[in-house]
């Protein structure tokens, strides 16, 4: 490279900017690749736009924008110097003290075993004229000061990825209890000694809780692995209703573990010192003698013994490197994302859409490619498939690699992709653990939105579901079709093959709990896959079905079949369910999934000769002056049996009052309960509860239900507030017509996010209306010119499949635990466990959560 002259620097001085507080500085990662300052060519940061580029892509940015001046960062690793106290360059990692990631005392994902030397230069394109950071002294003051201030500001600024990580996940953020300032404490309490405590109902001397109302000392809950207590403290709450308890042994002058049984969470008690003094406990003199709940949970998170089967931990695995075997770094509870994208980019359609067309996508990228969906997905696919980042961890300065690094690669860190895919989403924008199935559908939805007028790889998953409802009183039927991407397979636990062993285990477990002994070895239910398939296709009774033939309620049966078979069949095992107390739980079940699968028997037949359809008649409506009780004016848009699909009046038929009341009594908002019954088509309490649990974190969860063609609550008319033009433009840019954009916005009170969701869920109706417009006089050419969609495209073929991938979950809930995936490549199974990519020896095909089957060519 030639040396940078004063004249050259003066020529670009006006374009050099000093980053301000609101600027995003991308100095950790290339916008088009996963190159970093540690890559061989370093990273070039534009000193005007603050975008970062690897050596391969910096000229692309220069040619597109004309920006010439860049800050070149190059970092090289060297081993940490020996610690004088330990005599090693690898000092012991600090034990985490908080159940958190990326905060003081939490799990430190960035802790490395090496230090970095940094080389900083200013480079001017296209001739790559350069000057070192410390070589600016000979320049005129005005030039030196301007360049130096920009360089120092760039180096000291928080990078865009760092700002994203500042949203650190912290499992310890606790709220002040609603009982803290109004807690009732009984008179004349017993004095609590400073030590020597024992449960008043058993012999437990640890995991003890002091009830802050009556001073009872009782043991805590039993944990899922059999450790913990005997549940006496929570049983006492159920008997008395006394809500707050403090864990003995955790009381210090700084605080203690306080649990609210009423709020079902760890809480803060600002009046704790006062509450403890009621029992003669001086908080300032207490010392910690027991583990806090956080420490216990951290211990469980660090123990992976129960996960050995899925991670194949007990078997030496051969690490794999090269194209298609690239690991993905865990960005803090991002294993759900890692597993899903590994599977998607093993499918040829996604490779063709994003990787094969990489150059075209990059060429058409906007000025800021970090905010472009197609660019970031293409970048991710190339990073996974190119092999450029699938190399062993670099050797240290002495030429050796530590043993545990031999099977680990640097892999890629998809920070930009994660930030973009989660932007605006209440869950995926956080660093909390998520459900892989929900993320899969979210990603599918994002792909759908960005492929309106181009090749859509989602077609490999898309299929039509045929639902047949038969009124038992009249024998008349109704057929409907809907689009889906996942086959959700129920688990009939009563079909377990080892019922006797399960009953014996439950009896041994009960005895062990009574006698305070260790729990017996776990016995896992073994359910045949054929039983799951039978349960999926079995008729389902629908009570209180509104029969349009009778114009009255009746009993019906519903059967579900495939109207088409997709190229790739995605099967979700419904392991996560609810107990009788509506508490989420995970079924510990083993299902031997077949390598070869034939579901031809589930092909739908449509209306058969001799079958008579139910009349297409709207049910009676509730008028404003009729009593509505707790229901309001809400109905079901999907089933003609409940209401008309098109609303022209402000009223709609009632929903199942008993289900709504049942949900409200559980503490859920009335409007959310109405929506739950509405969107599940009066299918009963369980279906409505499942909807509630899966939508609790939606920003509009408790907002009133607004039906298409009706005004929102409190508004006079949707037309009174015309849709904003920028929202219309945004929807039109996604490939929809202006009429469709206006209709969607009016149906959702001009909410852009909800309008996009609405338009996708009503695409069939919109297409039908577009076709009607053509038949009423509009020319086909006019229709094509407005890019009217032609409806969801589905592929169909034989129902024979072969297993090619599955995602497994470890843990008791989708909100915690860990995900890995197994993919069959080049005739062998491969396990992808974040950065570790290895040949699989014993793929646990019976313990998966989501399975991916590929159609077998006939």
From Swiss-Prot:
Changing residue 666 to E: Lower affinity for triubiquitin and tetraubiquitin, but no effect on affinity for diubiquitin. No effect on activity. Residues 654-695, 722-762 form the UBA domain. It is found in: Cytoplasm; Cytoplasm, Stress granule; Nucleus. Keywords: Acetylation, Cytoplasm, Disulfide bond, Hydrolase, Isopeptide bond, Metal-binding, Nucleus, Phosphoprotein, Protease, Repeat, Thiol protease, Ubl conjugation, Ubl conjugation pathway, Zinc, Zinc-finger. Its EC number is 3.4.19.12. Residues 326-856 form the USP domain. GO terms for biological process: negative regulation of proteasomal ubiquitin-dependent protein catabolic process; negative regulation of T cell mediated immune response to tumor cell; negative regulation of ubiquitin-dependent protein catabolic process; positive regulation of proteasomal ubiquitin-dependent protein catabolic process; protein deubiquitination; protein K48-linked deubiquitination; protein ubiquitination; proteolysis. It comes from Homo sapiens. Changing residue 199 to A: Decreased rate of activity and decreased zinc binding. Changing residue 219 to A: Decreased rate of activity. Disulfide bonds join 195-816. Ubiquitinated by SMURF1; leading to proteasomal degradation. SUMOylated at Lys-113; SUMOylation affects the interaction with Cav3.2 channels. The keyword Repeat applies. Changing residue 232 to A: Decreased rate of activity. The modification Phosphoserine is found at residues 149, 156, 779, 783, 785. The UBP-type zinc finger domain interacts selectively with an unmodified C-terminus of the proximal ubiquitin. Both UBA domains are involved in polyubiquitin recognition. The gene is USP5. A zinc finger (UBP-type) spans 175-283. This is Ubiquitin carboxyl-terminal hydrolase 5. InterPro entries: Papain-like_cys_pep_sf, Peptidase_C19_UCH, Ub_carboxyl-term_hydrolase, UBA, UBA-like_sf, Ubiquitinyl_hydrolase, UBP13_Znf-UBP_var, UBP5_UBA1.
């Amino acid at each position: 490279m030639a040396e940078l002259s004063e004249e050259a620097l003066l020529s670009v001085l006006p374009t050099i900017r000093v980053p301000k507080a609101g600027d995003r500085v991308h100095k950790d990662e290339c916008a088009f690749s996963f190159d970093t300052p540690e890559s061989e060519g370093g990273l070039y940061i534009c000193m005007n736009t603050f975008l970062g580029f690897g050596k391969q892509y910096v000229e692309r940015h220069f040619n597109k924008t004309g920006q010439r001046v860049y800050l070149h960062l190059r970092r090289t690793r060297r081993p940490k110097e020996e610690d004088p106290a330990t005599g090693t360059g690898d000092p012991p990692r600090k034990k985490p003290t908080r159940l958190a990631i990326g905060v003081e005392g939490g799990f430190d994902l960035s802790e490395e075993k090496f230090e970095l030397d940094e080389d900083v230069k200013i480079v001017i394109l296209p001739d790559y004229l350069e000057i070192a950071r410390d070589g600016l002294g000979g320049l005129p003051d005005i030039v030196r000061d301007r360049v130096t201030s920009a360089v120092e500001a760039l180096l000291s600024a928080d990078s865009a990825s760092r700002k994203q990580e500042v949203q650190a996940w912290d499992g310890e953020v606790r709220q002040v209890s609603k009982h803290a300032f109004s807690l009732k404490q009984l008179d004349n309490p017993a004095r609590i000694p400073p030590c020597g405590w024992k449960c008043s109902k058993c012999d437990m001397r640890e995991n003890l809780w002091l009830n802050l109302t009556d001073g009872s000392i009782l043991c805590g809950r039993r944990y899922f692995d059999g450790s913990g207590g005997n549940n006496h403290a929570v049983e006492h709450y159920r008997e008395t209703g006394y809500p707050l308890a403090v864990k003995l042994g955790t009381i210090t002058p700084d605080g203690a573990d306080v649990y609210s049984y009423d709020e079902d969470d760890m809480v803060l008690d600002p009046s704790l010192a006062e509450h403890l003094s009621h029992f003669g406990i001086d908080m300032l003199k207490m010392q910690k003698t027991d583990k806090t709940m956080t420490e216990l949970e951290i211990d469980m998170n660090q123990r992976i013994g129960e996960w050995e089967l899925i991670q194949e931990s007990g078997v030496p695995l051969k690490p794999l490197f090269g194209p298609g075997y690239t690991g993905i770094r865990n960005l803090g509870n991002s294993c759900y994302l890692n597993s899903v994208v590994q599977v998607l980019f093993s499918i040829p359609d996604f490779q063709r859409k994003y990787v094969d067309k990489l150059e075209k996508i990059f060429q058409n990228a906007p000025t800021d490619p970090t905010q472009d969906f197609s660019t970031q997905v293409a970048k991710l696919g190339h990073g996974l498939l190119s092999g450029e980042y699938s190399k062993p961890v670099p050797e240290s300065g002495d030429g050796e690699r530590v043993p545990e690094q031999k099977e680990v690669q640097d892999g890629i860190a998809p920070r930009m992709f994660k930030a973009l895919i989660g932007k605006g989403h209440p869950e995926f924008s956080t660093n909390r653990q998520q459900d892989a199935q929900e993320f899969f559908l979210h990603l599918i939805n994002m792909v759908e939105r960005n492929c309106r007028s181009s090749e859509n790889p989602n077609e490999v998953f898309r299929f039509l579901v045929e639902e047949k409802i038969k009124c038992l009183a009249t024998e008349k039927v109704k057929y409907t079709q809907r689009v889906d991407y996942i086959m959700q397979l129920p688990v009939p636990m009563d079909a377990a093959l080892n019922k006797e062993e399960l009953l014996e285990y439950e009896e041994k477990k009960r005895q062990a709990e009574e006698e305070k002994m260790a729990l017996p070895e776990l016995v896992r239910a073994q359910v045949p896959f054929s039983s799951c398939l039978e349960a999926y296709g079995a008729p389902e009774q629908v009570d209180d079905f509104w029969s349009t033939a009778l114009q009255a309620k009746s009993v019906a049966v519903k059967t579900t079949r495939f109207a088409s078979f997709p190229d790739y069949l995605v099967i979700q095992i419904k392991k996560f369910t609810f107990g009788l107390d509506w508490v989420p739980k995970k079924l510990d079940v083993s299902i031997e999934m077949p390598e070869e699968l034939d579901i031809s028997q589930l092909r739908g037949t449509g209306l058969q000769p001799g079958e008579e359809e139910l009349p297409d008649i709207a049910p009676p409506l509730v008028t404003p002056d009729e009593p509505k009780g707790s229901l309001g004016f809400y109905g079901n848009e999907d089933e003609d049996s409940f209401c008309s699909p098109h609303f022209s009046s402000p009223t709609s038929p009632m929903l199942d009052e008993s289900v709504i009341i049942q949900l409200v009594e559980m503490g859920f908002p009335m409007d959310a309960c109405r929506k739950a019954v509405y969107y599940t088509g009066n299918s009963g309490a369980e279906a409505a509860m499942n909807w509630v649990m899966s939508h609790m974190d939606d920003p509009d969860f408790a907002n009133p239900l607004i039906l298409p063609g009706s005004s929102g609550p409190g508004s006079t008319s949707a037309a009174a507030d015309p849709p904003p033009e920028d929202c219309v433009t945004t929807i039109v840019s996604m490939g929809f017509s202006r009429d469709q954009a206006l209709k969607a916005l009016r149906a959702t009170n001009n909410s852009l996010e909800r309008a996009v969701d609405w338009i996708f869920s009503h695409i069939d109706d919109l297409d039908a209306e577009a076709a009607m417009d053509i038949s009423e006089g509009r020319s086909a050419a006019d229709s094509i010119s407005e890019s009217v969609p032609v409806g969801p495209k589905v592929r169909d073929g034989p129902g024979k499949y072969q297993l090619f991938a599955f995602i497994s979950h470890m843990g008791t809930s989708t909100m915690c635990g860990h995900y890995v995936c197994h993919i069959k490549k080049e005739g062998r199974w491969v396990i992808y466990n974040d950065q570790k990519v290895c040949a699989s020896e014993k793929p646990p095909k019976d313990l998966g959560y989501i399975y991916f089957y590929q159609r077998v060519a006939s």
